[in-house]
C-alpha cells in the first residue's frame, strides 16, 4: 500500500497495484516458464513425452495452461487487496476486474514468450535470461523514448507496428477498465 502511494492518492482503486504488474511479470513469468521445455530436453524426458499417445499440440497447450493456471492462482492470492479497497471506499469494481483480466492476459503473453524460448534451449538459465530480455523489449517497445529513436529513419507505419508489440500500451487501457 505504501509503495504505490495508495493512501496519499485519496482514491479507492487498485491502479498503483496494477502499475507494477508488467515489471513484476517481466521477472516472475520467465522464472515460471524457464523449465517448461528446457528441463524436458536436458533430462531426456522430451522423447518420452513426445511418444505418449497425445499430439504435440496437446502437450504444448497442456504445459501452457498448467503454467497459466499457476499464475492465475498466484494472482488470486491478491484478492484480499481488492476486499481491502472495498472496505476502505467505494471503488469501481468493474475497473478492478478489468485490471485482473488484463493482468491474466499479460501473464499469458509473457508465458507464451517464455515457453517458446524454453523450447529453443536446454538450459534453464539461458531460457530465463533470454525470456527476460524479450519481455523487457516488449515492455519498452511502446515508450515514447524508444519510438523517438526509430522515428528519424523509419516510416510511421513501422512505428505503429513496433508500438503495437508493447504490453504496456495494451495494459494501460485495460487497467483503466477499457477492454477493446
Where are these regions (language model features)?
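Hydrophobic alpha-helical transmembrane segments
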Residues: 1-39, 64
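Secretory targeting signals
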Residues: 1-3, 11, 24, 65-125
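Terminal transmembrane helical anchor/hairpin motif
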Residues: 6-7, 11, 130-179
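Membrane-interfacial segments
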Residues: 7-8, 41, 45, 85-93, ...
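Transmembrane alpha-helix boundary/anchor motif
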Residues: 28, 32, 76-80, 112, ...
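Helix-loop-helix units of permease transmembrane domains in multi-pass membrane transporters
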Residues: 36-66
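Helix-loop interface residues and adjacent transmembrane-helix termini in multi-pass membrane transporters
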Residues: 53, 120-121, 178
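Alpha-helical transmembrane segments and their helix-entry boundary regions
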Residues: 59, 127-128
